[in-house]
């Protein structure tokens, strides 16, 4: 029977992580469980840096961006000996289960702990919206608003100077954030990992727009697709139009979470406690068609596929 749980945030921070921690803590305390917060993700778990959390520990946290527990990259956690130390630290503290809030790398850590016999629940916390088994991740909608606001501002200056603007959006190898922001921001061109990209084809489309009288344009592109400064130089050379690239970078991860992210994080945090009390370990939480769901974390990582919103892409093309 579970009496004490641990909670940590791992990987890149996302708006709503604090709300998720709050959801976990308050739901657990309501059920009579103790909660230990683990500082700086798996690194803090390995180094045994933990603190007892109560209701006041998470007061005024629901509206705060980032994660008050901190986060860190810790690739050494792939080492089974490192994980064995982490599990020993958990057991030494009397912790019976662990809630992990983070992206796919964080899920991989939870999967490996699960395979070693320690029950974990994964909550999807990443702006990339690239986690399998869920329609949306904690932080995605806040980041979407941030990106759209940036696109709106870029459009103001691009139209003033009849310029082509390239905006690089986070997402790692998932184009969800780019695609949604491009549609909401009225971008003329969208470049995402899920669709084959050829810069000559992009230039041809831009030239076609210019021939129709288009004075400016915005190209939204997912990070890691190419060097955006080189792409800007190529477009300017081929079209004769001034072209500038803007990398939004880590500003996309910051800021107070929007209401939907706060609600999603709170629901998922409380649901994680429900699952643990029902005897479920080794699960990851998602939301599908606005219903909370859970999947086997090993199966989710190894076998599940995340569909690309191809219908959204087709819609976007009609709006160019």
Curated annotation (Swiss-Prot):
Its EC number is 2.7.1.11. Substrate binds at residues 126-128, 163, 170-172, 223, 244, 250-253. It is found in: Cytoplasm. ADP binds at residues 22-26, 55-60, 155, 186-188, 212, 214-216. It holds the Pfam family PFK. Pathway: Carbohydrate degradation; glycolysis; D-glyceraldehyde 3-phosphate and glycerone phosphate from D-glucose: step 3/4. Coiled coil: none annotated. ATP binds at residues 12, 73-74, 103-106. Keywords: Allosteric enzyme, ATP-binding, Cytoplasm, Glycolysis, Kinase, Magnesium, Metal-binding, Nucleotide-binding, Transferase. It catalyses: beta-D-fructose 6-phosphate + ATP = beta-D-fructose 1,6-bisphosphate + ADP + H(+). Its cofactor is Mg(2+). The active site is at residue 128. GO terms for cellular component: 6-phosphofructokinase complex. Mg(2+) binds at residue 104. Catalyzes the phosphorylation of D-fructose 6-phosphate to fructose 1,6-bisphosphate by ATP, the first committing step of glycolysis. HAMAP family: Phosphofructokinase_I_B1. Belongs to the phosphofructokinase type A (PFKA) family. ATP-dependent PFK group I subfamily. Prokaryotic clade 'B1' sub-subfamily. This is ATP-dependent 6-phosphofructokinase.
């Amino acid at each position: 029977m579970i009496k004490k749980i641990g909670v940590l945030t791992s990987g890149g921070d996302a708006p709503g992580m604090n709300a998720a921690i709050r959801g976990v803590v308050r739901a657990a305390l309501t059920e009579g469980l103790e909660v230990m917060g683990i500082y700086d993700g798996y690194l803090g778990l390995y180094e045994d840096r933990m603190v007892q959390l109560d209701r006041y520990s998470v007061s005024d946290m629901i509206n705060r961006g980032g994660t008050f527990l901190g986060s860190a990259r810790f690739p050494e956690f792939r080492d089974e000996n490192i994980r064995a130390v982490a599990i020993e630290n958990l057991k030494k503290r009397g912790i019976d289960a662990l809630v992990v809030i983070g992206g796919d790398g964080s899920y991989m850590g939870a999967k490996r702990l699960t395979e070693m016999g320690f029950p974990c629940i994964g909550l999807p916390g990443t702006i990339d919206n690239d986690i399998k088994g869920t329609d949306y991740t904690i932080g995605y909608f806040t980041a979407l608003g941030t990106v759209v606001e940036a696109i709106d501002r870029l459009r103001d200056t691009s139209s003033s100077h009849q310029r082509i603007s390239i905006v690089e959006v986070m997402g790692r190898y998932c184009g969800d954030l780019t695609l949604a922001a491009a549609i909401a921001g009225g971008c003329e061109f969208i470049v995402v990992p899920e669709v084959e990209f050829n810069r000559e084809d992009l230039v041809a489309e831009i030239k076609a727009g210019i021939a129709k009288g288009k004075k400016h344009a915005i190209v939204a592109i997912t990070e890691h697709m190419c060097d955006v400064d080189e792409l800007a130089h190529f477009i300017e050379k081929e079209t004769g139009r001034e072209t500038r690239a803007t990398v939004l970078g880590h500003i996309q991860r910051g800021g107070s979470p929007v209401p939907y992210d706060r609600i999603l994080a709170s629901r998922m945090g409380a649901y994680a406690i429900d699952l643990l009390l029902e005897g479920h370990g080794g699960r990851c939480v998602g939301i599908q068609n606005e219903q909370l769901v859970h999947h086997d974390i090993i199966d989710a990582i190894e076998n599940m596929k995340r569909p690309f919103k191809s219908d959204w892409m087709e819609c976007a093309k009609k709006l160019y």
